[in-house]
Amino acid sequence: MVLKRVRCYYLIITIRLKMKVFTNKNLSIEQYGFINTFPNQNYILSYLHPYNPYSSLIVCYDVGLGKTYAAACLAHMYLDSGFKVLYLSNSLNSIDNFSNEYEKVVLDSRLNSLKKNITIKSFSKFYNCEKRGESDNVDYGLIILDEVHNLRESAYRYKLIKNKLDTMNNSKILVITATPMIDSKDELDSILSLTKETSRIIFSENKIDIKISYVGQEINGETLFLSEMKGQQLKEYLKVVNEENDTVYSSSRQASISLSNKFNPSIPLDEQSSKINAFINSIKEGELTVLFSFYVKRGIDFTSSVLESIGYKKWNSNKKQKRTYAVIDGRTNKKNVEEILTSFNSIANIKGDNIHILLGSSVLSESITLYRVKHLHIISPFWNYGQIKQSIGRAIRIGSHEGLEDKSMKVYLHAAHYDKEGKDIDIWKIAYDKNKDIIKRLEELKIDNEFSNDSLLDIPKIDNEMVIKINEWVWDFRNCFDTNKFKISWCKIYEDKAIGYNLENNTKIMGNIPSYIRINRPIPGGYTIWRSCIDKKLRISFIDGEVNKFSKRGKLISNVNTSEIAKDLNCENNIESIINTLKEQNRYFDKQIEYDL
């Protein structure tokens, strides 16, 4: 067994982002009340804010890091500001997922009224409408292109959609993909050209602390789960290899999975399918297992019949059964998909009491989350790492292994062979070689976008008075007060001159003081004692309508006539008693700038 961290499986890089300065006071994202957004999501929301000047952003965050939720939050910001939103994706799972995520964002009665201003279409539907001249001509404030790697599948569709985007000059564009390059390092260029400007492209480091171990032995640089074909399967495989003249090896790939569409109990399993025989032998009781197969009949259908031959039953929502399996493929309707996923992901299924084994085709490989999976099998090799990454990403996400003491998963990249040779091994090698070129291109991007934190942010020295550090933020309030060496004024405080530096994503914002930071000032309706952040001295002020007993900057507490104040406050005639009385009334501030997390 080869033990690796998930970040070793494919290149995951963090690009340090060049500093952007946001100056509009309305740019705060706190006002929207988003729950549980992470720094990588907040960067998207801040950068592509409706009132920021930037018109596009390409997000290449890895699977499982909340790209769709961030897109839903961003859509809400535009809808709340009166704009319309267009969401495009070619994955029905992605479309449903985005709609569900938006419902999590809006926690009030405005959901339906806001949601009607979101147009949701597949790339194919959008393409067909444009092709027929049925453009809606809506002036969208935001266009979201999700799973954009699917847009490259059709050159004609890509060109028409790109031409349409080029005419939508007033729209901002958010491009989302976990796999910007699948088959070629040049594919990134087609994504970059979808936007109207030189777009910022951002990657993220995967901080999901789940161990992945690849089971098998290393062949051509990749850890493969080998199984040797024999008997009738090997005869069938060699026959189709000799007859096959196409370059995609469709027949031999299917033959390498199984001999036929259904298990024949009169023939030993290892002579019908070396892969499924190895799969069956790897099954562990009490540990959830997922199997992906590109081919339905020789993959999923054959595996289903094998499972039933050893006592497994197909999951039925109306029956309580033990040792069950479920299937999600192109034949599974939407309602059944939802029921299967709900049952599989339930905490009650942590040991497979509802569904032990889930079989899935390519429809399961995008925009679906699977929880607490311990074993993941890919029995049909892919031509590229993008599809591998998408499949594994279904089960490795933020919170995907909560409830398990051992947060780890085993991955089995199946390869059938004879004498360590075969089309499976060839295809895995092609994918591996492609990935080396893609990694090189990504490394070049990393170098092109590498910046120094110090040179970009120029963060002032923290003094815990006018410059304070709170978590990943440093806040500078030195320009917020109308003061010089001769005057100190509490009445003119310029909150829009506060500067915030985010140390995690290298952003700089102005005028967006979060709600947990307070700049204290005299309270109307009486006396207030406050310590000025300018000279650190205690001052007392009195405000009652238009009445000001002292100057606007207050009066030093050491210089006041205590008898008059003590009489007004009905306390003893000394400074200590006056201070204690105002403390009891919550009208005493020892620090002008306070924060409460």
UniProtKB/Swiss-Prot annotation:
Enzyme class: hydrolase
Pfam family, one: ResIII
Positions of the Helicase ATP-binding domain: 48-198
The keyword Hydrolase appears for this protein: yes
A molecular function GO annotation: ATP binding
Gene3D superfamilies: P-loop containing nucleotide triphosphate hydrolases
Top-rank lineage group of the source organism: Eukaryota
Motif (DEVH box): 146-149
SUPFAM superfamilies xref list: P-loop containing nucleoside triphosphate hydrolases (SSF52540)
UniProt keyword annotations, A-Z: ATP-binding, Helicase, Hydrolase, Nucleotide-binding, Plasmid
E.C. no: 3.6.4.-
This protein's record includes keyword Cell cycle: no
Transmembrane regions: none
Sites where the protein binds ATP: 61-68
UniProt domain Helicase C-terminal: residue ranges: 275-467
Family affiliation: Belongs to the helicase family.
Role summary: The presence of the two linear plasmids, termed pGKL1 and pGKL2, in strains of Kluyveromyces lactis confers the killer phenotype to the host cell, by promoting the secretion of a toxin able to inhibit the growth of sensitive strains.
PANTHER family: DNA EXCISION REPAIR PROTEIN ERCC-6-RELATED, SNF2/RAD54 FAMILY MEMBER
Protein name in the entry: Uncharacterized killer plasmid pGKL-2 helicase
Organism: Kluyveromyces lactis (strain ATCC 8585 / CBS 2359 / DSM 70799 / NBRC 1267 / NRRL Y-1140 / WM37)
Highest classification ranks of the organism: Eukaryota, Fungi, Dikarya, Ascomycota, Saccharomycotina
